[in-house]
Amino acid sequence: MLKRQLGTLFLAICLTLTTVPSVLGGENTQTITVTGDGSGDYNCDGVDDHVQINQALEFAAANPGTTVQLKGPFTYDIGGSLLIGSDTTLAGDSGVTIKLAKGLPLWGSRESSIAEKKAMIMIRGGSASNVKIENLTVDGSQSDYYPGIRLGTSSYNMATIINCNGLTIQGVTFQNGCNDALLISKSSNVMIDSVTVNKCGHDGVYAYHVNGITVKNSKFINRTNSSVRFDSVTDGVMKNNECTTSGGGYAGLELQGNLKNIEASGNYFHDLPVPAVIRLNTQETNVNIHDNRIENCG
């Protein structure tokens, strides 16, 4: 009798534990696939592929914890913003590129506000939390389709992330852009790790009014402005990055505005046309720049 009672109790405990995540509102993790060969949950054909990717991202937004996996090798044609919602991961296989489509009307301008700086990757619905972007190449198509665009005029950003709490970007390459690779504003708890920015059109990482951002283990090849730009940032870290130039550009680290608790260390700045670190109209509290390697700058 005692064994039977213990067995019944054990079964009841197991059943209770299996229901706890749903009771507590836990996420159901799953992966849905987007492909270019017809084998995915959503299938693209190399033209206006943002339509199918956004369908997958819309499903993910309604099902927190979902990963949208872009299968490769394949180049996805992006003629509209990819809109990422909360608790969503956008990830790529090896050989995956999302590439700005040709012949698009102008996205953004020097006169546009940050919120109006339309980009290849943006936040769905005005705000989000716990967003991850991993393991893909973002190609801004500047030399291919938009050679007439003047670099640094706020046109065709690769990513504009506004009002996001909890953002991780890892293993992503941003290349051949017309303006910023990553413009992040009014956001918090941002991690940028092992990213490559190769010849974007303005800043590699532009953080404006951000609370908590780390940029690490990344490589920046400037051609228009700075590798990393902290403007009105609290709790910002830049460490173990390499910053250089393709023949133009500005600083490795550009500091502006009200800055509090900033650290830049372990970085390798070399062959930049100006000083490695530049301050423009800053008001600083606890800004520490130390143990960086600087060669042939400014």
Model-found features: residue ranges?
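Secretory targeting signatures
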Residues: M1-G26
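Right-handed parallel beta-helix/beta-solenoid
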Residues: G25-Q55
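Leucine-rich repeat
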Residues: L57, I121-G125
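Hydrophobic pocket-lining residues that define ligand/cofactor binding sites across diverse proteins
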Residues: A60
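N-terminal extracellular ligand-recognition/capping segment immediately after the signal peptide
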Residues: P64-R110, K117, V138
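Short glycine/acidic-rich loop motifs that flank beta-strands on beta-rich extracellular proteins
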Residues: I78-G80, S94, K99-L104, Q142-G148, ...
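All-beta strand scaffolds that present successive hydrophobic residues in beta-strands
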Residues: T89-D93, A128-I133, L167-Q170, N189-D193, ...
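Right-handed parallel beta-helix
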Residues: L104, G126-S227
